[in-house]
Amino acid sequence: MKMVAPWTRFYSNSCCLCCHVRTGTILLGVWYLILNAVVLLILLSALADPDHYHFSSSELGGDFEFMDDANMCIAIAISVLMILICAMATYGAYKQRAAWIIPFFCYQIFDFALNTLVAVTVLVYPNSIQEYIRQLPPDFPYKDDIMSVNPTCLVLIILLFISIILAFKGYLISCVWNCYRYINGRNSSDVLVYVTSNDSTVLLPPYDDATVNSATKEPPPPYVSA
């Protein structure tokens, strides 16, 4: 007979490279934290020196302005929010506080849904890929080579690429979810479940049989004082 904790059942506690889900969630949170910090630094430098990051309409092949002040402020706010969410997930996994992981998990679900929507759009409207490629700047790398590819093959390649991304994102979602369940189980219950190797159980006898057996037993000898 061995003792099994409730939080170790029904799901895996290990993720990629055989590390624990807590370790994987911490590494994932730190990685996202670094990426968003780099993006925030780039946005702040672009806001401080807009001439250095200025792109004209002719360079972009369109009649619109690239990253105006309003869009820049929105992007900075999103980056700050993402840094906060990633920091909360990292802290929650390290300190075993399940509630701190929920915002990061919700972000993963939202990101997965957006990528799924892109895959569905490519599948339903395959001609939209060609239209999007035509709108790219003339000096975009490998634009002519991409345009020369068969449209059906191009759609299949893009769908395969998106499917790989979705599978990887789904795996990361499962790792974070298993970490949440593991921490939530440890914090909410300290009861150990005893698992036996056989199915035998101990049953109490019926009440009538117990009373009859107790009545047929000989009474104890009388007490004699010394």
Swiss-Prot record:
InterPro entries: LAPTM4/5, LAPTM_transporter
Localization: Endomembrane system; Late endosome membrane; Cell membrane; Cell projection
Primary localisation category: membrane
Region entry Required for NEDD4 interaction, spans: 205-221
Keywords: Cell membrane, Cell projection, Endosome, Lysosome, Membrane, Transmembrane, Transmembrane helix, Transport, Ubl conjugation
GO cellular-component term (any): lysosomal membrane
Chain segments annotated as transmembrane: 26-46, 72-92, 100-120, 153-173
SS bonds (residue pairs): none
A Pfam family per the record: Mtp
Membrane topology recorded in Swiss-Prot or TrEMBL: Multi-pass membrane protein
Tissue-specificity statement: Strongly expressed in fetal ovary, testis, adrenal gland, liver and uterus, and weakly expressed in the spleen.
The protein's role, per its UniProt record: Required for optimal lysosomal function. Blocks EGF-stimulated EGFR intraluminal sorting and degradation. Conversely by binding with the phosphatidylinositol 4,5-bisphosphate, regulates its PIP5K1C interaction, inhibits HGS ubiquitination and relieves LAPTM4B inhibition of EGFR degradation. Recruits SLC3A2 and SLC7A5 (the Leu transporter) to the lysosome, promoting entry of leucine and other essential amino acid (EAA) into the lysosome, stimulating activation of proton-transporting vacuolar (V)-ATPase protein pump (V-ATPase) and hence mTORC1 activation.
Similarity-based family: Belongs to the LAPTM4/LAPTM5 transporter family.
Oligomer status and interactors: Homooligomer; upon reaching the lysosomes. Interacts with MCOLN1. Interacts with NEDD4; may play a role in the lysosomal sorting of LAPTM4B; enhances HGS association with NEDD4; mediates inhibition of EGFR degradation. Interacts with PIP5K1C; promotes SNX5 association with LAPTM4B; kinase activity of PIP5K1C is required; interaction is regulated by phosphatidylinositol 4,5-bisphosphate generated by PIP5K1C. Interacts with HGS; promotes HGS ubiquitination. Interacts with SNX5.
The protein's name: Lysosomal-associated transmembrane protein 4B
Natural source organism: Bos taurus (Bovine)
